[in-house]
């Protein structure tokens, strides 16, 4: 864990604030484009926020936070309680959304607050890589970091699309035409926006291996069909029943076995656990690729279920 202090807080757009964090002892760990940190909030919540400053910077971490009406308390706490000089505990950076090695060209797509990891990618790619960035927002008032991007070295590769300005509409079919194996796509934003970009890419013939995404929130899941199952800990042989209305994490907690977790939605990867036997319900760790899901060898015990009566976990 890192003890951090809020050096500055700025309004970046309507309902979006940035928070510049520095280590109390002056040292911060390296990070790569696409990385995020866990932020431990005053009321006990832990939330993940993408780093959006240049990845070569070592003196600060910059995060952007949307005050979401559907917030479970995290974004509201930051907006209403955290000001300059506030102390926060944060994790080391972790990256589940890295840039692909060896890509000849990159297409970056961001919707709303999804600009945060994408902006960091653009900063890294700007030095020597071929890319373009498409940023979609409802209006100019809701476009975060827009002036920073328009003044950046990659401004000529920035394309901004506002819902209120139909003439700026994104022609996704044209942008995604002629897919190639060494061209990679990255997308982050609201679920509907991401689905539109990814489905459009697949319709154009893009390979799954070239499609990269990061979700900030999981889509609603119908849990009515959830049933009970059992998990076995490989290290001890203990077996625990998981009722339909409880998660694996909560069941293990009741027996004194703690698993680090954060989002409880299968999006952050904190609790990702190897499955040694049995078949997990693979769609709920939404950050896994289709190929990774097909392996059936890992799942997120904060929310994932099982297709088989027993899962043997690498715990």
Swiss-Prot record:
This protein's record includes keyword DNA damage: no
Primary enzyme class: oxidoreductase
Protein's name according to its UniProt entry: Vanillate O-demethylase oxidoreductase
Highest taxon listed in the record's lineage: Bacteria
EC code: 1.14.13.-
Stretches assigned to the 2Fe-2S ferredoxin-type domain: 227-315
Gene Ontology BP terms: lignin catabolic process
């Amino acid at each position: 864990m890192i003890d951090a202090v809020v050096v500055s807080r700025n309004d970046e757009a309507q309902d979006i604030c940035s928070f510049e964090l520095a280590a109390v002892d002056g040292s911060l760990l390296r990070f790569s484009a696409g990385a995020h940190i866990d932020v431990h909030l005053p009321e006990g919540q832990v939330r993940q926020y993408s780093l959006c400053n240049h990845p070569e910077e070592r003196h600060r971490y910059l995060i952007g936070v949307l005050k979401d009406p559907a917030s479970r308390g995290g974004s509201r706490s930051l907006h209403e309680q955290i000001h300059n000089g506030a102390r926060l505990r944060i994790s080391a950076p972790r990256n589940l959304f890295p840039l692909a090695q060896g890509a000849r060209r990159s297409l970056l797509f961001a919707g709303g607050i999804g600009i945060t990891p994408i902006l960091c990618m653009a900063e890294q790619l700007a030095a020597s890589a071929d890319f373009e960035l498409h940023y979609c927002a409802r209006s100019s008032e809701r476009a975060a970091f827009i002036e920073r991007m328009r003044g950046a070295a990659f401004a000529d590769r920035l394309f901004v699309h506002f819902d209120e300005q139909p003439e700026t509409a994104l022609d996704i079919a044209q942008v995604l035409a002629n897919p190639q194996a060494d061209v990679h796509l990255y997308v982050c934003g609201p679920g509907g926006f991401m689905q539109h970009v990814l489905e459009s890419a697949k319709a154009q013939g893009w390979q799954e291996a070239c499609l990269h995404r990061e979700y900030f929130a999981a889509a609603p899941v119908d849990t009515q069909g959830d049933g009970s199952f059992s998990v076995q800990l490989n290290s001890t042989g203990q077996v625990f029943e998981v009722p339909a209305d409880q998660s694996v994490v909560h069941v293990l907690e009741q027996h004194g076995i703690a698993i680090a977790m954060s989002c409880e939605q299968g999006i952050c990867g904190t609790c990702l656990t190897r499955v040694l036997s049995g078949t997990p319900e693979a769609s709920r760790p939404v950050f896994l690729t289709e190929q990774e899901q097909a392996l059936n060898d890992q799942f997120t015990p904060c929310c994932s279920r099982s297709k088989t009566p027993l899962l043997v976990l690498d715990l």
